[in-house]
Amino acid sequence: MKIKTTVFGYPRIGPKRELKKALEDYWNWKISKVELLETANSLIIQNAKVIQSSGVDLIPSNEFSLYDFILDHSVMFNAVPKRFNRISDPLDRYFAMARGTQELPALEMTKWFNTNYHYIVPEIEDEEFELMENKPLREFALLRDSLSVKTKPVIVGPFTYLKSAKLNMDRVERLSEKILPAYKKLLIKLDAAGVEEIQIDEPAMVMDMEEREIELLTGLYRELTKGLTLKVYIQTYYEAVSAYEKLVFSLSVHGFGFDLVDGKENLENILTLGFPSDKVLIAGVVSGRDPWRTDFTVVMSMLERLFRVTDKIMLSNSSPLIHLPITVEAERGHIQEDILNMLSFANERLEELTILKRAINDGAALPARKSIVHEIFSKAEVRSKISSIDEKAILRKPEFQERYRMQMDSLKLPLFPTTTIGSFPQTKEVRKFRADYKNGKITEEEYKKFIFQEIEKAVKIQEELDIDVLVHGEFERTDMVEFFAEKLKGFAITKNGWVQSYGSRCVRPPVIYGDVWRDKALTVEETLYAQSLTPRPVKGIMTGAVTILQWSYPRKDISRREIAYQIALALKEEVLELEKRGIKIIQIDEPAFREGLPLKRNKQDEYFDWTINSFRLTTADVSPFTQIHTHMCYSDFNEIIDRIYALDADVISIEASRSKGEILSAFENFRYDHGIGLGVYDIHSPRVPSVEEMIEIIERSVSLIDKSLFWINPDCGLKTRGWQETVASLKNMVLAAKAMRKREV
């Protein structure tokens, strides 16, 4: 029997970030709705052509989204909060749900599992669902008519969709009965339209599962697939399926897709427990998350073992390709060849699947490949420092209460001190100067002069707004990780390696190919210049080791712990130099602290062990008079508040404005006695919040948090916002702080 290939999650942004440009042009009234949708359809067809031409057999559809695929499902099933009903245009309503408007707060946005992709959390009010728009059918028809190809529509399954809404299990069970008819109607319509195969993504199946969840899933798919002629495949990824035997042998579907790269236990389960003889095994053998070339020898060995269990195998990627840039070819001449030859992005994954298929079906020889060797980029001094770390001795002294008193006496800050997270708006002019400098159109001297002028502007604006602790604005930084990766040894920066983070926001994850170390200052010059302009304290701001690691592509030959420690030691040198040069507040941003948390509970303690140590390693040797801040993005804060406390940062700011109720509930059960700033407004939306809105958040916060420890700040950096809305929002934030201080007089 000849095996086939399929893929899923191909990047939707376009090879030249066409989606980003079209979205931002539409939001800025530069193009019409018709033009935006024409771009979308063009990208859908273009992506399908790329997959088709690579030799992949089963081509996916319904994977394109104008903003987020979970939001697409909310709109498709009419899970639209009532506050958005006043917007009559469906497309504008869709974007308002994602981004908010001046009058309407956006839906919450959070990380998708343990990735750096953000999704829009469903906000389910009515508990009534209806199939309003059949987007999967529309895209199936578009590709059928354009390319004469029958595609495999991809949808998110009901279990994962409801779990993504962050509901308790009682509500998930109740809503599953309500949403099932809408899903059923969708599948019936696809079946009637000639769809032969459908992929239903249920990555929530890799989480730890209770017995009632297993029963719910079994019942859902029994009803969902009843009477259908199309083949239903359940796709899982990011980890091994939980309750393998109970689910895989009982769910009424045609096949299962398993991650055999990050879910090693899947392979063990198949080999020891077997696989249903009447189902297809979709083997995820090429990685959707890391950029390293597939080792064909290892994969062929694994497939030989799988063929002893079942001959019904289809080859695929392990997880959505959306986490990879589009092609390595776009980096030729930019990244050195010996590093480039180690890499494989989305298009190369398609090629790898075809190579494997031909080797199995036709006996074609596998191409000769040198093994990936990171050791040639090693540094003995770095290895020596890592081996001498005493993890039990990484502690700050004295205790927090004494340190904080010393710091606040020295800094002379008022009650409810105000600050921002770090970045200020990066205008077109800022981006142009940076591009001109990188392309050799202006000199380093001209570029630095411009950056220093922007720093002067930012400091002046902050002083005029009467903000207490200032920042330099980060105008020299393209991205909070890329900036440090460019300056540290051991990282490669791509030129076109864009990956979608959310909506129109794209990032370029650096590639860690060797040992990491610091051979020059990273932030000192800009920070000292800003401090020279003002008597107010200016924060030195750096991205922490865990976030740099999590938002990069790590090497695979050593542990993530060791990579994080290498980065932490490099950052520690920078922290101590900033302190030596007179900077009194240093912020180590760790927005991805929780993001890399293993999905299985039994693997989480080990993760927290090295992530906490990485932060402490960066900060433990500073003076007690130096105040250490950290910033984190919200994601299930309640579950990890004790781990965040263990970082022993003097002040933490949290991205919490879209989920403030959930954040505050954490403090009802945990006495957090360090400094804390809960973001008082949402920077992901262009709306300017009122003073009253912010005061309400502060009041709720200080009912649970000691007011002497409470800081007031936005919930994230301001890089993506415009100056007008930034100044207006910060003005209201300072007014809110002053109003709170007056009450305490």
UniProtKB/Swiss-Prot annotation:
Keyword line: Amino-acid biosynthesis, Metal-binding, Methionine biosynthesis, Methyltransferase, Repeat, Transferase, Zinc
GO molecular function annotation: 5-methyltetrahydropteroyltriglutamate-homocysteine S-methyltransferase activity; zinc ion binding
InterPro entries from the UniProt entry: Cbl-indep_Met_Synth_N, Cobalamin-indep_Met_synthase, Met_Synth_C/arc, UROD/MetE-like_sf
Bound cofactor: record note: Binds 1 zinc ion per subunit.
UniProt family annotation: Belongs to the vitamin-B12 independent methionine synthase family.
Binding site for L-methionine: 421-423, 474, 589
EC code(s) of this entry: 2.1.1.14
Residues annotated for 5-methyltetrahydropteroyltri-L-glutamate binding in this entry: 17-20, 111, 505-506, 551, 595
List of residues binding L-homocysteine: 421-423, 474, 589
Gene Ontology biological-process entries: methionine biosynthetic process; methylation
Protein name as it appears in the record: 5-methyltetrahydropteroyltriglutamate--homocysteine methyltransferase
CDD domains the UniProt entry points to: CIMS_C_terminal_like, CIMS_N_terminal_like
Pathway stated in the Swiss-Prot or TrEMBL entry: Amino-acid biosynthesis; L-methionine biosynthesis via de novo pathway; L-methionine from L-homocysteine (MetE route): step 1/1
Alphabetized HAMAP family for the sequence: Meth_synth
